[in-house]
C-alpha cells in the first residue's frame, strides 16, 4: 500500500471523541467521507470515519467506535493518511503527488522533470528545476504518458 499524507491531528474537540485535523489536501471531498478509511500515525492504525464537518480551518472527524475524548487523546499530534488505492478521483483528475518524475514540456520544448509538488494555500505548485508552475487548469494543457504539457506563459520560464 502507498499512503498519502492528508493532514495532522492537532487537537480534540469537545468530549465526544471528535478530533481536529489540519489539512491542506486538495481532494478533501474524496477523503473525509463517512465510511472511508483513514490511517493514523507511524504504525498506520486504521479508522473508519463516522462523521465529518468543517469548522473554521479544521476538518472535524469522529471515528466509528470512539465516543469519548479519552479514547482519541493518544492520536493528538499524529499524521493522517489515506491509501492511494482508496482515493477515487473524478475522470480527468490526477492526484498531484503522482506527477513527481513526469517530464514537463512547454509546447515541444522539454524543460525538465517534476521534482516536487508543493502544497500551497491557493493551489498545488509543480517544481521543475528552478521553475514553479501552478497546478491549475489555466497553466496545464494536458497530462498523458507520464508527460505534463504546460502553456507558454510569458515570464514563466
Where do the PLM segments sit?
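Short Lys/Arg-rich amphipathic alpha-helical segments
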Residues: 1-157
Amino acid at each position: 500500500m502507498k499512503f498519502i499524507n492528508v493532514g495532522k491531528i492537532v487537537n480534540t474537540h469537545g468530549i465526544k471523541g471528535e478530533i481536529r485535523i489540519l489539512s491542506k489536501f486538495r481532494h478533501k471531498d474524496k477523503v473525509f467521507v463517512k465510511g472511508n478509511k483513514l490511517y493514523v500515525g507511524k504504525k498506520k492504525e486504521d479508522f473508519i470515519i463516522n462523521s465529518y464537518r468543517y469548522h473554521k480551518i479544521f476538518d472535524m472527524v469522529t471515528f466509528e467506535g470512539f465516543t469519548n475524548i479519552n479514547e482519541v487523546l493518544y492520536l493528538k499530534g499524529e499524521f493522517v493518511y489515506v491509501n492511494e488505492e482508496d482515493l477515487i478521483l473524478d475522470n480527468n483528475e490526477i492526484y498531484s503527488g503522482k506527477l513527481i518524475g513526469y517530464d514537463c514540456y512547454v509546447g515541444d520544448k522539454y524543460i525538465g522533470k517534476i521534482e516536487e509538488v508543493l502544497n500551497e494555500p491557493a493551489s498545488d505548485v509543480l517544481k521543475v528545476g528552478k521553475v514553479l508552475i501552478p497546478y491549475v487548469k489555466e497553466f496545464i494543457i494536458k497530462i498523458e504518458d507520464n508527460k505534463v504539457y504546460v502553456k507558454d506563459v510569458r515570464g514563466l520560464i
